[in-house]
């Protein structure tokens, strides 16, 4: 389905520079777009691609359109302060228009406990399990093999993709997206040591600590494929509104993730850690337990956080990749730091002694 620029602006705002009746039916990058497609410029370093693009129209910020000057002539633009966000909204609209609406109802192979509440407008796919006391609200979509445990609520308009599992006693807010294989509410990693003696004479074992809390997920949260969020030991693990979590992230028990925070893939957050609002956690970052990150903290990829960081800012502890030979030289220097320190101390002592003799 193609829409005119005028129709897009009526839906999403912005101003048109060029032909308001230009029709676009999809999106593409600047260097690949054709006359019936919409492209966008989010980074000024690609400004030259706007001059050569074949796109029917381009989403562009006012300052970048000014930089184009005469080169903008004859082209069509939607001028908006945030072309990237505009692109995302238009892309979602085209996806929604192209996606057939699934009929409400329960697939014959699904297992729904008689004590569960399932809204008439919900879509329940093949082999879904909904246990007693669970509540499936209006417009929820549960794809094949989804599991919803006893007493759990799935908020209105949420979509759980195939094989997602939400254990008992959890609350998922409205409009949540939980991707395939994600597990919400599995037991937190809690074991009490019960050992006697030392060394080879040590006897005993680890005693499992029952995890009696749940997981509370706010509205508009998205959780990536194969991500795991542990239930709390006593109180709930909490994911606040509009948090976005990538694939294969581990969030330990009793954590609280503040609203609008984003967490990239393979990050690990140990138990009882609090992350503030509007934070950004890079891929494969590791955050120790029982620490607090303030609002607007950014942790770069592969960094390790071992203490609280209350002040907003960018924090890094990862070592960037370098030439292999350079890395070996650096590693050798690190191994010899103790020897170098002792040599420096000896030189300082000798200089001090020499200075004392001269005096």
Swiss-Prot record:
InterPro entries: Hexapep (IPR001451), Hexapep_transf_CS (IPR018357), LpxD (IPR007691), Trimer_LpxA-like_sf (IPR011004), UDP_GlcNAc_AcTrfase_non-rep (IPR020573). GO terms for biological process: lipid A biosynthetic process. It comes from the Bacteria. The keyword Acyltransferase applies. Keywords: Acyltransferase, Lipid A biosynthesis, Lipid biosynthesis, Lipid metabolism, Repeat, Transferase. Pfam families: Hexapep, Hexapep_2, LpxD. One of its GO terms (cellular component) is membrane. Its EC number is 2.3.1.191. Pathway: Bacterial outer membrane biogenesis; LPS lipid A biosynthesis. One of its GO terms (molecular function) is N-acyltransferase activity. The active site is at residue 253. SUPFAM superfamilies: Trimeric LpxA-like enzymes. It catalyses: a UDP-3-O-[(3R)-3-hydroxyacyl]-alpha-D-glucosamine + a (3R)-hydroxyacyl-[ACP] = a UDP-2-N,3-O-bis[(3R)-3-hydroxyacyl]-alpha-D-glucosamine + holo-[ACP] + H(+). PROSITE patterns: HEXAPEP_TRANSFERASES (PS00101). PANTHER family: UDP-3-O-ACYLGLUCOSAMINE N-ACYLTRANSFERASE (PTHR43378), UDP-3-O-ACYLGLUCOSAMINE N-ACYLTRANSFERASE 1, MITOCHONDRIAL-RELATED (PTHR43378:SF2). Catalyzes the N-acylation of UDP-3-O-acylglucosamine using 3-hydroxyacyl-ACP as the acyl donor. Is involved in the biosynthesis of lipid A, a phosphorylated glycolipid that anchors the lipopolysaccharide to the outer membrane of the cell. Homotrimer. Belongs to the transferase hexapeptide repeat family. LpxD subfamily. HAMAP family: LpxD (MF_00523). This is UDP-3-O-acylglucosamine N-acyltransferase. The lineage of its organism: Bacteria, Pseudomonadati, Pseudomonadota, Betaproteobacteria, Burkholderiales. The gene is lpxD.
């Amino acid at each position: 389905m193609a829409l005119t620029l005028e129709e897009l602006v009526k839906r999403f705002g912005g101003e048109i520079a060029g032909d308001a009746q230009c029709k676009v039916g999809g999106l593409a990058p600047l260097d690949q777009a054709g006359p019936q497609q919409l492209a966008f410029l989010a980074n000024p370093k690609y400004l030259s691609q706007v001059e050569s693009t074949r796109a029917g129209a381009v989403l562009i910020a006012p300052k970048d359109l000014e930089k184009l000057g005469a080169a903008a002539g004859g082209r069509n633009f939607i001028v908006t302060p945030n072309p990237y966000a505009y692109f995302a909204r238009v892309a979602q609209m085209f996806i929604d228009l192209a996606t057939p609406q699934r009929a409400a109802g329960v697939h014959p192979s699904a297992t729904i406990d008689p004590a569960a509440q399932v809204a008439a407008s919900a879509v329940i796919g093949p082999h879904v399990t909904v246990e007693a006391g669970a509540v499936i609200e209006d417009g929820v979509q549960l794809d094949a093999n989804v599991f919803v445990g006893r007493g759990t609520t799935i908020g209105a308009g949420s979509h759980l993709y195939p094989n997602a599992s939400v254990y008992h006693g959890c609350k998922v807010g409205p409009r949540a997206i939980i991707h395939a294989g994600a597990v919400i509410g599995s037991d937190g990693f809690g074991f009490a040591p019960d050992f006697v003696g030392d060394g080879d004479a040590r006897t005993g074992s680890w005693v499992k600590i029952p995890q009696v809390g749940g997981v509370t997920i706010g509205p508009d949260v998205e959780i990536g494929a194969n991500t795991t969020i542990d239930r709390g030991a006593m109180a709930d693990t909490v994911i606040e509104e509009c948090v976005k979590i990538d694939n294969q992230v581990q969030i330990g028990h009793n954590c609280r993730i503040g609203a609008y925070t984003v967490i990239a893939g393979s990050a690990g957050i140990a138990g009882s850690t609090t992350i503030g609002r509007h934070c950004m956690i890079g891929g494969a970052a590791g955050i120790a337990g029982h620490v607090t990150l303030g609002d607007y903290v950014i942790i770069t990829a592969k960094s390790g956080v071992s203490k609280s960081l209350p002040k907003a800012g960018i924090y890094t502890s990862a070592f960037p990749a370098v030439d292999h030979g350079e890395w070996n030289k650096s590693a050798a220097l690190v191994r010899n730091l103790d020897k170098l320190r002792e040599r420096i101390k000896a030189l300082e002592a000798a200089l001090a002694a020499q200075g004392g003799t001269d005096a």
